[in-house]
Amino acid sequence: MDAATLTYDTLGFGEFEDFPETSEPVWILGKEFNALTEKDDILSDVTSRLWFTYRKNFPPIGGTGPTSDTGWGCMLRCGQMILGEALVCRHLGRDWRWVRGQPPRGEYIGILNAFLDKKDSYYSLHQIAQMGVGEGKSIGQWYGPNTVAQVLKKLTVFDSWSRLAVHVAMDNTVVMKEIKQLCMPWLDYGGAACAEPPGWMPTHNGCLEGACALAEEETALWKPLVLLIPLRLGLSDINKAYIETLKQCFQLPQSLGVIGGKPNSAHYFIGYVGEELIYLDPHTTQSAVEPCEDSQVPDDTYHCQHPPCRMHICEIDPSVAVGFFCRTEDDFDDWCMRIRKLSHTRGSLPMFELVDCQPSHFACSVDVLNLTPGKYQTLLSTFYLTCGGKGHSLDLSGKRHSLDLWGGVREGIFS
């Protein structure tokens, strides 16, 4: 894996000849660009994303563990990148741009501090690796997208500054009621509302005392949502019926991108052009960063200052997690409306279902996201035999199939 990776010191920063000369639109996290006339804008947008890579010479994980994550931490770094994008949207806004050498905002430094490679940073590699033990992953073991999503959900609980609501949608299903209960926990969904929200409102850390009061007001009635949707979009390869839907996710203004990649080699996908996905690659080993005496963070190595990497969409592993950020309830309602429109796109399949409430008859205990292709096919065959082969299609070439799961019919759970 390492033999094929770029080395930070050898990258040709500022060069853009690698990006295609095409009239096709370039989509990056909900923003559309013209590759012929807006190359500088594309590079600026890509460079402004937080780029988390392998690091070395950091304090041992757990006191006696690894001091580098080279070779095993790529999916953890991708998890940091998708969450880092959520924090940028939360505290700085999607249109914020990083400019090399420009004095940084306090919120930006606060975000970087949350990801430094040390045990007391909210989202450090140390925290993710140790929290992953509870998900059955030993330190140094490779993670899948679903495991990273579950770990990030647990870690955000301790971040009182960002006060995010993280929802991991399982079973290919997004339940709107569950999300609204999570983001507005003081509401009584039996009909009444509490007199006032519980006392979870934050105390800002020292470097962020001047945080905008308006931002607090905006989130007083809605905890900003990070929605992560782990998906399996095929067996060993992505089902081509999902390709257009996956691409259209990058067009949504709420897009946080996609974490996935190839087997045992994770990437953070931030957009697409034509049939190619645009991504940030964590497979570069850099030295761990220590804050300066004035609490500033040397940040050059947290931004990828070269043309973004690209991969044909058919090369992506079918196991992914798609991310979205909804700062307000209106953002979430808008996202729901857009997803419903996407579900009617001709010639493609929706990657997940959007429902008002969880069907009471459905309870799936099988972790399909972590099945190998062989076990996946065996499971499908088992359901086919159990159902007697009547009315339950197992066509994996792109057609939806319905399976009677524990008494309830679900469409596309194993698509």
Region spans (language model):
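Intrinsically disordered, low-complexity repeat/linker tracts enriched for polar/charged residues
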Residues: H392-L394, H401
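Short polybasic linear motifs
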Residues: G388-G389, S397
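Primarily extracytoplasmic ectodomains and periplasmic/lumenal surface modules that are beta-strand-rich
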Residues: M81-L83
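Cysteine-dependent deubiquitinase/ubiquitin-like isopeptidase catalytic cores across multiple families
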Residues: M1-S68, E85-L87, H91-G388, S402-S415
